[in-house]
Every structure is written in C-alpha cells, then in structure tokens.
Amino acid sequence: MDCIKFTVYGEPVAQGRPRGSIRNGKVHMRDPAKSKYFKQYVALVASQHRPETIITGPVSMDVKVYRPMPKSVSNSKKKKEKAEKGLLRPTTKPDVDNYVKGVKDALNHLIYKDDSQVVDLKVSKFYSEEPRVEVMIREVSA
C-alpha cells in the first residue's frame, strides 16, 4: 500500500467531551450527537478508500483541517487573501487534537485495527471558503 488519501467535505467537528448518565445503577458514556454524526460521516467517506485488508502495523497520519473563515477574515480583502495562502491561520479553539481525535476514532476497524497504531501524526489548521478535512495515511516500514 502506497498511501490512502481522502477528503471529508463540510465543516470539521471537534471531538466533544463524552456525556455520562446513570441507568440501572450503571454509568453509560456516549458521544455528543455532533461528534457522533461527524465520525459516521468520516467513516462513510473513508470506507470508499479502505484497503483490501485492514492495516495492522504502525501508520503515519497527516490531517489538514480547513475551518470556515470567520466574518472578521472574510470581510477583509487583505485578511482573506492571507488566509487563502495559509499565512493567516486559526489560533482559536477548538484545538487541533480535538479535531483529529474524531477522525482517528472513525477509522478504527476500517482503515487500521486501532488508532493506537498511529505512531506519527501531523495536524494543521487553516481557514478556507470550502471547509473540509484532508486525511493522508501511510504504513510505516520498520
């Protein structure tokens, strides 16, 4: 396998904190709805690029998160040009690790056996008129 690349179009969703409830004396944890649906969408897109056999060895991941431009950026021609060139980057919450958590979870048992196999990870945040998440996965050779 050379590499797996795919793009998830639409506004990226950061992994939210799990919600807990007690039923019949037991604690049940669940994903917030937005996170759950985003993971399902990522899995749907990734399933079109899945390898013939699930990857069982170490992998590297490169994730680029393109967030929608806020009005403060899109209303200013200079800021918009800088953002489109990648010179003006989002430094506000959510953090990059919260974006990638959902993506990694969505790929479990689909691309790789478990997200613990990710040994190299690069995540970048950008602004764009076309919000999306670009994912590239490579097997790491020993």
From Swiss-Prot:
<dbReference type="GO" id="GO:0000287">
    <property type="term" value="F:magnesium ion binding"/>
</dbReference>
<dbReference type="InterPro" id="IPR008822">
    <property type="entry name" value="Endonuclease_RusA-like"/>
</dbReference>
<protein>
    <recommendedName>
        <fullName>Uncharacterized protein YqaN</fullName>
    </recommendedName>
</protein>
<dbReference type="GO" id="GO:0006281">
    <property type="term" value="P:DNA repair"/>
</dbReference>
<feature type="compositionally biased region" description="Basic and acidic residues">
    <location>
        <begin position="81"/>
        <end position="94"/>
    </location>
</feature>
<feature type="region of interest" description="Disordered">
    <location>
        <begin position="70"/>
        <end position="94"/>
    </location>
</feature>
<dbReference type="Pfam" id="PF05866">
    <property type="entry name" value="RusA"/>
</dbReference>
<dbReference type="GO" id="GO:0006310">
    <property type="term" value="P:DNA recombination"/>
</dbReference>
<dbReference type="InterPro" id="IPR036614">
    <property type="entry name" value="RusA-like_sf"/>
</dbReference>
